[in-house]
Design a protein with these regions (language model features):
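Hydrophobic ligand-binding cavity/cleft-lining segments
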Residues: 1-44, 140, 146-152
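Short beta-strand segments that buttress and anchor functional surface loops
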Residues: 46-52, 73-80
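Short coil-to-beta-strand transition motifs
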Residues: 53-61, 82-85
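Acidic/polar residues at beta-strand termini and the immediately following turn/coil
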Residues: 67-68, 79
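Short, conserved beta-turn/loop elements at beta-strand boundaries and strand-helix junctions
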Residues: 68-73, 97
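Beta-strand/loop substructures that line and gate deep hydrophobic ligand-binding cavities in soluble
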Residues: 76-139, 148
């Protein structure tokens, strides 16, 4: 449920909200599951950047390319609507009966030397924000599990 409600205009990215808002992203990370945000289908978009941010008229929103309920969400941007082809995916892998592992993968196809340089410069920021996202989801999921687990 946490992954389905991701987005700048929904549940946030569960990362470093103050840092995101310091650069004007206007994130509000949800600390509960919102029933109104629990439906996500192929073709919907997950907004990462609000309209107008740093001159981006439409902001940045990644379309949902594939979704397998309770298992994975794949977001993909590609030409001609976007400058380059990129995929950001989330995969929930069951571990034992009461645990799971969340894998986050990203890749992009770069055609110009400047794009490669940009990706290398953005790498540390992406790593930091991905770590924040993983820790934020972990904290929320574990907290919900502690509250809702059956008595021992």
């Amino acid at each position: 449920p946490w992954l389905v409600q991701m987005g700048q205009d929904r549940g946030g990215l569960y990362s470093y909200e103050r840092l995101e808002n310091l650069v004007g992203l206007k994130y509000h990370n949800a600390d509960r599951i919102h029933p109104e945000w629990q439906r996500l289908t192929v073709g919907d978009v997950v907004r990462l950047v609000p309209p107008g941010w740093l001159g981006r008229r439409d902001g940045l929103a990644l379309p949902v390319a594939q979704i397998i309920e309770g298992q994975s969400i794949v977001l993909r941007q590609q030409p001609p609507q976007f400058a380059f082809d990129a995929v950001w995916s989330f995969h929930v892998m069951p571990r034992w009966e009461d645990r799971c592992r969340l894998l986050v993968r990203s890749r992009s196809r770069m055609r110009q030397p400047g794009e490669v340089l940009g990706a290398e410069l953005a790498g540390p920021v992406m790593a930091l924000m991905t770590r924040g996202l993983l820790l934020g989801i972990k904290r929320r999921a574990e907290q919900a599990w502690r509250v809702n687990r059956p008595p021992a």
